[in-house]
Amino acid sequence: MQFTSVYGLKNIVRFGSVVTLSWLLPLSAHAIDVHPTAEQIQAALDQGKEAAQKRNPPDTFYVRFGATDELHPSGFLITKLGGLSVMATHMALRGLQPSEAEVTQVLDGQTMLVSTVIFGNAPNFAVDSYMVFEQGGKAIKPVTVRFDGFAHRSAAWPESPKFKAKVIASFNYADFDPKSHTTITVFPATGGESSFNVDFSRIH
C-alpha cells in the first residue's frame, strides 16, 4: 500500500458520477469521544475482554458504513474508544491485558482512521486517490492518505467492476466536528467518486 502526505495538496476536482451510499451505524459502535471519561475507557476495555470471551473478532468494534455486499463501496472508521476495545480483544485472545502505557497511547492519538474499499476496472485505478470529509459545506482534508498501488480482483471478475482497492486516510480530531452529519468522499485519480453519508452523532 502506498502512502502520501496531503499537506499542500490543492483543490480537488470532482469527476464523473457520484455513488452515494448510506448505512445505519451499529448500536455496538463507540461514540467519537475525543476526551473520554474514565468510566467510558473502562467500559471499552471491558467490552473488548467480553468480546474475546465470546470469541468475537476485534473488528466487531469498527464503525462500518456503505454497502454490505462485495461489489459496492464500503468502509469503516475507528474511534478512540473503539480502538481500546479492539486492542483489549486482541490481547485478551492471547491471555493478556493492555498496559497503562498502551491505553495512553491510544487515548493520546491525534487522528481518526477511516478505511474504505472502492471499485474500478484497472489494476492501478486507486493510485493517487484522495479522501475528504464534508461538514456543513466545509471540506476537511486528511493528514495522510494511503492506497493500494495494485488493486485486487473483485468478486465480479472478469466482469465490471473488475478490481477493488483500499483507500485509507487519517483525519485530525481538531479539524472536524465529531458530532456532525458528515459526507466522506473518495476521489480516485482516474475519475469518479464514491460518497458515504455518515451521521457522526449517531455513533453510540
Regions found by a protein language model. Give the residues of each.
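Bacterial N-terminal signal peptides
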Residues: 16-26
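Conserved functional micro-motifs across diverse proteins
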Residues: 31-204
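Short, intrinsically disordered, low-complexity terminal segments
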Residues: 10, 26-28
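Prokaryotic Sec-type signal peptides and long signal-anchor helices
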Residues: 7, 17-19, 65, 204
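N-terminal secretory signal peptides that target proteins for export/translocation
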Residues: 1-11
